[in-house]
Amino acid sequence: SVSYNKLGGIAEARNDYKAAEGYYAKALEISKRLAKKYPDDPNLQRDLSVSYNKLGGIAEARNDYKAAEGYYAKALEISKRLAKMFPEVPMLKDDLALSLFKCGTCSADGKLSSEQKAMLRSAAAIWGELYEQTGYELYAERRKIAQNRLNQCSE
């Protein structure tokens, strides 16, 4: 599934969303099969979440917000479960924050519901905690992006 995700990323970078969607769908199919066969393997569960997020990104780029929300919600469900099972793993907390951010910003008209704003606040808080724990600048940058998106909604 990793190879299909990489091919999808190349197609997406070329704005070839149809090809990207095809590759990501193949990655999702493989990830689903493996995650079902090995439900206790967190890496396979994470791969499944990544595939849902990638398909959500393609749907959002095509302005299919309903489909994007569905994919993002599935990724969020998996990310929540993994972060709860392995709270000591920063990467899984980051995945949770990314899923919260994607669900929190997916909007056809740019307006966010109170639930989406809460998701953005949660994502920013998680990234803030990760930055404090690790000192990794990427987490500080992501926290700032989430906070800026919240501030845009308040204006």
Task: Kindly label every feature range from the protein language model.
Residues 125, 129-131, 135-155:
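C-terminal non-catalytic interaction modules
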